[in-house]
Amino acid sequence: MERELALEIVRVTELAALASAPWMGRGDKNSADGAATSAMRAMFDSVSIRGTVVIGEGEMDEAPMLYIGEEVGSLNGPEVDVAVDPLEGTEIVAKGLNNAMSVIAVAGKGQLLHAPDMYMEKLAFGPALVGKLSITDPMEVTLKKAADALNKKVSDLTVMILDRARHEALVKVLRKVGVRIKFLSDGDVAGAMAPAFPEAGIDLYVGSGGAPEGVLAAAALKCLDGELQARLMPADGNEYNRCVEMGIEDPYRVLTMDDMIGTGDVIFAATGVTPGEFLGGVRYLSDQRAETHSIVMRAKTKTIRFIRTLHYLPNKTMLSSGLEMAVSGSKE
């Protein structure tokens, strides 16, 4: 993949973020997601790839665009797998909370795991813990290993986990051991990435979340020299069979980084919609301008770019009427 592709991809996440940001705090997650999806799909036409969506908005009969198997890009350029989440954290945007972002990962053809839409158990951590932890260990053992490797007391560890009822038993274990817990209302990809950013102050990300989001997070962590280990959690026979149909012969086995994103190059881009652990959100400025804050990374070179971009909104012709609502509001 050419290095110029990284900047092409981040322009796509920027537009999706700008499209969804006007819906922040309006209680309408479907409109926010729809705006991001429409903008992302339109912008993909200008990207120099022959891409196939392997993680997207659902199956062909479930989503009008960015569905699994859809071809995207200008169809001139390298053949690649594409994983997208136009709006990671739809509920976050609807409620005006933190950590929503627009996300894309691109890898060579056949690299990305076709993750089924089900829960996945996850253990994510930064470079200092790579190769030292196993998702198969009891949580108490994992925390002790992490503390030893980081030269900390167990009670000084900070663990991030989604605030969900299904995590009640796991939270009890974390409380018993005595670690600090930072609950995340939503935003599974951002949560799994957080341990790789020292400024976030997170040592581990644990618990279960969406399998497609796990692949996106693994792509990011490869660029950040972190690691994500995972296990699919099929809820019934139908979900188990779905895994097998998608080529995962043993759905319960541990999935490594190589299983999820392959051994080749990966490009990851994300643009903040609302402020988060490591990205700022969309900010509306005077004179019909807006500022976005993005990250774009490439595994091959380990280059990590944080990009602040000023946009003149009337020139964003691909944006929907939702943006016009925000623009008119900024003039009042």
Question: What does each model-found stretch correspond to?
Answer:
Residues R3-L7, G27, E91, V130-K132, ...:
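A short glycine/serine-rich beta->alpha loop
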Residues M101-S102, K122, L313-K316:
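A short local loop/turn or secondary-structure capping micro-motif enriched for an aromatic residue
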Residues A107-S134:
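Flexible glycine-/small-residue-enriched beta->alpha junction loops
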Residues E71, L97, V106, A128-V130, ...:
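Short capping/connector residues at structural and topological boundaries
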Residues T136-R289, H293-R298, R308:
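An extended, acidic
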Residues V72-G73, V103-A105, G201-Y205:
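Short basic, glycine-rich beta-strand/loop surfaces that mediate nucleic-acid
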Residues G77-E88, I92-Q111:
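DPxDG-like acidic metal-binding loop motif
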